[in-house]
C-alpha cells in the first residue's frame, strides 16, 4: 500500500508525534500541513490568522493539503482541516484517514505542556479546557465522518503506531 495516510484530530491529539513515528516505520515521507504553511509563507499560524483571518488561513490549509498529498506520505493535518467539506472529501478519496481521538481534558493537558502549541491563536478566547470542549463538540462529527479508522490517542504513541501498522497490514491482505 502506497497511498497517503492522513492524520486528523484536535490540537494536541498527537498527529505530528504519531505521524512522524508512523512515517519512519513505513519508510514514508512525513509532512505537517501547519509547518508546511509556516515554512512556505515564512509566517507563524498566529501571523497568518492575524493577516488573513481564519477564512484565509483555512483556504491556505486546503491548498497545502492538496499540495502535499502524494504516495508514501503521512500527512498531519491541522485540527480544523475537517471543517471544509471539500477537504473531508479529498482526504477520503486520496488516502486513508486516521482520527486520533482524545478527551478535552487530555488535549488541554498536552497543550499546556507544549510551548509551541501554546503560541497558537485561541479559537474561542476561552480557557483551554473550555475551548477544547467547544472544539470537540463541533468537530467530533466531522472527524468521525472523514475517518476510515478511529484510534484512542491517549495511549502511548508507539502503541498507536503499532495499531496503525496492523490496520495497514489487514488492508493489504484484503
From Swiss-Prot:
<feature type="binding site">
    <location>
        <position position="155"/>
    </location>
    <ligand>
        <name>ATP</name>
    </ligand>
</feature>
<keyword id="KW-0963">Cytoplasm</keyword>
<keyword id="KW-0028">Amino-acid biosynthesis</keyword>
<feature type="binding site">
    <location>
        <position position="16"/>
    </location>
    <ligand>
        <name>Mg(2+)</name>
    </ligand>
</feature>
<dbReference type="GO" id="GO:0005524">
    <property type="term" value="F:ATP binding"/>
</dbReference>
<keyword id="KW-0808">Transferase</keyword>
<feature type="binding site">
    <location>
        <position position="79"/>
    </location>
    <ligand>
        <name>substrate</name>
    </ligand>
</feature>
<dbReference type="GO" id="GO:0000287">
    <property type="term" value="F:magnesium ion binding"/>
</dbReference>
<dbReference type="GO" id="GO:0004765">
    <property type="term" value="F:shikimate kinase activity"/>
</dbReference>
<dbReference type="GO" id="GO:0008652">
    <property type="term" value="P:amino acid biosynthetic process"/>
</dbReference>
<keyword id="KW-0057">Aromatic amino acid biosynthesis</keyword>
<feature type="binding site">
    <location>
        <position position="58"/>
    </location>
    <ligand>
        <name>substrate</name>
    </ligand>
</feature>
<dbReference type="GO" id="GO:0009073">
    <property type="term" value="P:aromatic amino acid family biosynthetic process"/>
</dbReference>
<dbReference type="GO" id="GO:0009423">
    <property type="term" value="P:chorismate biosynthetic process"/>
</dbReference>
<protein>
    <recommendedName>
        <fullName>Shikimate kinase 2</fullName>
        <ecNumber>2.7.1.71</ecNumber>
    </recommendedName>
</protein>
<keyword id="KW-0479">Metal-binding</keyword>
<keyword id="KW-0547">Nucleotide-binding</keyword>
<keyword id="KW-0067">ATP-binding</keyword>
<dbReference type="InterPro" id="IPR027544">
    <property type="entry name" value="Shikimate_kinase_2"/>
</dbReference>
<keyword id="KW-0460">Magnesium</keyword>
<feature type="binding site">
    <location>
        <position position="34"/>
    </location>
    <ligand>
        <name>substrate</name>
    </ligand>
</feature>
<dbReference type="InterPro" id="IPR000623">
    <property type="entry name" value="Shikimate_kinase/TSH1"/>
</dbReference>
<feature type="binding site">
    <location>
        <position position="120"/>
    </location>
    <ligand>
        <name>ATP</name>
    </ligand>
</feature>
<dbReference type="InterPro" id="IPR031322">
    <property type="entry name" value="Shikimate/glucono_kinase"/>
</dbReference>
<dbReference type="InterPro" id="IPR027417">
    <property type="entry name" value="P-loop_NTPase"/>
</dbReference>
<feature type="region of interest" description="LID domain">
    <location>
        <begin position="112"/>
        <end position="126"/>
    </location>
</feature>
<comment type="function">
    <text>Catalyzes the specific phosphorylation of the 3-hydroxyl group of shikimic acid using ATP as a cosubstrate.</text>
</comment>
<dbReference type="GO" id="GO:0005829">
    <property type="term" value="C:cytosol"/>
</dbReference>
<keyword id="KW-0418">Kinase</keyword>
<dbReference type="Pfam" id="PF01202">
    <property type="entry name" value="SKI"/>
</dbReference>
<feature type="binding site">
    <location>
        <position position="139"/>
    </location>
    <ligand>
        <name>substrate</name>
    </ligand>
</feature>
<feature type="binding site">
    <location>
        <position position="32"/>
    </location>
    <ligand>
        <name>Mg(2+)</name>
    </ligand>
</feature>
<feature type="binding site">
    <location>
        <begin position="12"/>
        <end position="17"/>
    </location>
    <ligand>
        <name>ATP</name>
    </ligand>
</feature>
<comment type="pathway">
    <text>Metabolic intermediate biosynthesis; chorismate biosynthesis; chorismate from D-erythrose 4-phosphate and phosphoenolpyruvate: step 5/7.</text>
</comment>
<dbReference type="InterPro" id="IPR023000">
    <property type="entry name" value="Shikimate_kinase_CS"/>
</dbReference>
<comment type="similarity">
    <text>Belongs to the shikimate kinase family. AroL subfamily.</text>
</comment>
<comment type="subunit">
    <text>Monomer.</text>
</comment>
Amino acid at each position: 500500500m502506497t497511498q497517503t495516510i492522513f492524520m486528523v484530530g484536535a490540537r494536541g491529539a498527537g498527529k505530528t508525534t504519531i505521524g512522524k513515528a508512523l512515517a519512519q516505520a513505513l519508510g514514508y515521507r512525513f509532512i505537517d500541513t501547519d509547518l508546511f504553511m509556516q515554512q512556505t509563507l515564512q509566517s507563524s499560524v498566529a501571523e497568518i490568522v492575524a493577516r488573513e483571518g481564519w477564512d484565509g488561513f483555512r483556504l491556505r490549509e486546503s491548498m497545502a493539503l492538496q499540495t502535499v498529498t502524494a504516495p508514501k506520505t503521512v500527512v498531519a493535518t491541522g485540527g480544523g482541516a475537517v471543517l471544509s467539506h471539500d477537504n473531508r472529501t479529498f482526504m477520503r478519496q486520496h488516502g486513508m484517514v486516521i482520527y486520533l481521538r482524545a478527551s478535552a481534558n487530555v488535549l488541554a493537558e498536552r497543550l499546556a505542556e507544549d510551548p509551541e502549541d501554546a503560541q497558537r491563536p485561541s479559537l474561542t478566547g476561552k480557557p483551554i479546557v473550555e475551548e477544547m470542549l467547544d472544539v470537540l463538540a463541533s468537530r467530533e462529527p466531522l472527524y468521525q465522518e472523514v475517518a476510515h479508522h478511529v484510534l484512542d490517542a491517549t495511549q502511548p504513541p508507539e502503541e498507536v503506531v503499532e495499531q496503525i501498522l496492523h490496520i495497514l497490514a489487514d488492508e493489504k491482505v484484503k
